[in-house]
Swiss-Prot record:
GO CC aspect terms: ribonucleoprotein complex; ribosome
One term of GO molecular function: rRNA binding
Protein name: Small ribosomal subunit protein uS8
Family the UniProt entry places it in: Belongs to the universal ribosomal protein uS8 family.
Length: 133
């Protein structure tokens, strides 16, 4: 059976692993998922991730989750905004701080995938992929 929303599946795997207090979770690989994981690491929502070869053509990503001192996941909220059935686009002038700059928007622009803060700085709009805090 084919997957209709691979990014949504990745977010669900990360969300469920965090709630179950797992240290890592395995996510099927793709270029867009790698870009999203890079931004999650840069923003401090995950510790790290590494590429795991499944075979010569496929790779997965092993995501190392991050927790606070009380063993609560750093990622409190991970919401898929734009889905294959309902695309959500935003202009650069409409990008606002999410949750008083505690959260992050991830936007797919013509210059690549970036945070909402960077997209606003570069005056680029695009498709809102997800929001997290």
């Amino acid at each position: 059976m084919s997957m209709s929303d691979p990014i949504g599946d990745m977010l669900t795997r990360i969300r469920n692993a965090g709630r179950a207090k797992h240290d890592t979770c395995l996510v099927p690989g793709s270029k867009i998922k790698k870009s999203i994981l890079d931004l999650m690491k840069e923003e401090g929502f995950i510790r790290d991730y590494e590429s795991v070869k499944v075979n010569e053509t496929f790779e997965d990503y092993k995501v190392f989750l991050k927790y606070d001192q009380t063993k609560r996941p750093i990622i409190r909220e991970l919401i898929r905004v734009s889905t294959p059935g309902r695309r959500v686009y935003i202009k650069s002038t409409e990008i606002r701080p999410y949750k008083n700059n505690i959260g992050t928007l991830i936007v797919s622009t013509s210059k690549g995938i970036m945070t909402g803060k960077n997209a606003r700085k570069l005056k680029l709009g695009g498709e809102v992929i997800l929001k997290m805090s």
